[in-house]
UniProtKB/Swiss-Prot annotation:
Keyword field contains Transferase: yes
Superkingdom assignment: Bacteria
The organism of origin for this protein: Corynebacterium diphtheriae (strain ATCC 700971 / NCTC 13129 / Biotype gravis)
Name of the molecule in the record: D-inositol 3-phosphate glycosyltransferase
Family: Belongs to the glycosyltransferase group 1 family. MshA subfamily.
Oligomer status and interactors: Homodimer.
Keywords: Glycosyltransferase, Magnesium, Metal-binding, Transferase
Molecular function GO labels: acetylglucosaminyltransferase activity; D-inositol-3-phosphate glycosyltransferase activity; magnesium ion binding
InterPro entries on file: Glyco_trans_1, Glyco_trans_4-like_N, Glycosyltransferase_grp1, Mycothiol_biosynthesis_MshA
Known EC number: 2.4.1.250
Lineage: Bacteria, Bacillati, Actinomycetota, Actinomycetes, Mycobacteriales
Length: 427
């Protein structure tokens, strides 16, 4: 059996970048994690991304069968994600040049996010191979769920996403809810959508012993016997950090002597975002002495944050799945999350955590108080959370994705030749 070779496209963020700040987040974790598992299954994966510094080198050999290829497209620094559409042609040209010079032939293209999808669409027509596309987020959904004052996604992005829905051979989504979103907002054909739940690294993210928890808290400078809430992710309005901080202020207004701490682990994302904005918010709310801000951490260190926490809060305005919620549960920590997007699948309400309707800080304070004050229920949820997370692994996700690639390759054999032979003037 011949080895399958996949060209993944992730133009706006490298899967090797530290998640939790800038444009690096759950998508980075998704791409590198599932690509590693595909490589271990014998699938060769090349991930094309835009070079952001000269020291990166053209090719990074991550492990056997997995490479990250850095393509120069525009200046290394100074371009925001919103400006990257100006470099799509340069990036596509760089991918084509690299593949030609190194005699690369691929079986399937898999693009991630709408910017990469535009490049993938072009490459599909050029290479005459099928395109699998994963949106990760959708403009129409983000706009429908955005918070007051948050920036609206552009109509140009929505149009590009519509083009990808209409032209990709297979669309991969995380949950059935995402399928519904594609059908509702983009008139997608549900038969062209494959649902593959992401996973968590359950070998790394494991429940710690009491000694692990105490050691983690000592390293973080947190008292051993206080109640701890953690927020992990980019500090941007859409992720809802302000919701959590205002909920904490509400809890302390009700009971100023409540013994608790909050860990905010992540960096700013977006042109106007700064950590100082949230630090100043804690000061204005009178809770600065209860909140500790941490820089983004690699997974090997992040597990200690999850283990140090009694509860992990995910107050996002939308999540296609919620990898932070799954990592926290794999670590044995219950989650309080917004009932949006894929979070009701990632978190089992009343069993592995609590889902909150809406983003009212008072409602969040109620939910957090109830869980923090009920030690037996919280401990029971922690045990159930580990069992639940065990059903979501990257190995299982990669097995399903490899099957999708096989289906796409068969589609190419059966249909793509006639389609392109009949009319390449469509491009």
């Amino acid at each position: 059996m011949m080895t399958m070779r996949i060209a993944m496209i992730s133009i706006h963020t490298s899967p090797l970048q530290q998640p939790g700040s800038g444009d690096a987040g759950g998508m980075n974790v998704y791409i590198i994690s599932i690509a590693r598992e595909l490589a271990r299954r014998g699938v060769d994966v090349d991930i094309y991304t835009r070079a952001t510094r000269p020291s990166q080198g053209d090719v990074v050999e991550v492990e056997s069968g997995l490479r990250v290829i850095n393509i120069v497209a525009g200046p290394y620094e100074g371009l925001s994600k919103e400006e990257l559409p100006t470099q799509l042609a340069a990036f596509a040209g760089g991918v084509v040049q690299f593949a030609k010079c190194h005699h690369m032939r691929y079986d399937v293209i898999h693009s991630h996010y709408w910017l990469s999808g535009q490049v993938g669409w072009l490459l599909r027509d050029l290479w005459n191979i099928p395109l699998v596309h994963t949106a990760h987020t959708l403009a129409a959904v983000k706009n429908a769920h955005r918070s007051a004052g948050d920036t609206e996604e552009s109509e140009a992005r929505r149009i590009c996403e519509q083009q990808l829905v209409d032209n990709a051979d297979i669309l991969v989504v995380n949950t059935p809810e995402e399928t519904n979103d594609l059908v509702r907002h983009y008139d997608a054909n549900p038969d062209s959508v494959a649902v593959i739940a992401p996973g968590a690294n359950v070998e790394l993210f494991t429940p710690g012993t009491q000694r692990n928890t105490e050691q983690s808290r000592r390293c973080l400078g947190i008292p051993l016997h206080t109640k701890v809430m953690a927020f992990v992710g980019r500090l941007q309005q859409f992720k809802g950090p302000e919701v959590l901080l205002r909920a904490v202020a509400e809890m302390l207004e009700r009971d100023p002597d409540r013994d608790m701490r909050v860990i905010m682990c992540g960096g700013p994302s977006g042109a106007a975002a700064t950590v100082e904005h949230y630090i100043e918010l804690t000061r204005s709310l009178g809770i600065a002495h209860r909140v500790r801000f941490l820089d983004p951490r690699p997974p090997e260190e992040l597990v200690s944050v999850y283990q140090a926490a009694d509860v992990v809060a995910v107050p996002s305005y939308n999540e296609s799945f919620g990898l932070v919620a799954m990592e926290a549960q794999a670590s044995g920590t219950p989650v309080v999350a917004a009932r949006v997007g894929g979070l009701p699948i990632a978190v089992v309400d009343g069993e592995t955590g609590v889902l909150v309707d809406g983003h009212d800080p008072i409602m969040w304070a109620d939910a957090l108080e109830q869980l923090l004050d009920d030690d037996p229920t919280r401990q029971q949820m922690g045990v159930a959370a580990v069992e639940h997370a065990a059903n979501f692994t990257w190995a299982a996700a990669a097995e399903k994705l490899e099957s999708v690639y096989g289906d796409a390759a068969m589609l190419d054999v059966a249909q793509c030749h006639d389609r392109y032979a009949a009319g390449s003037d469509r491009a």
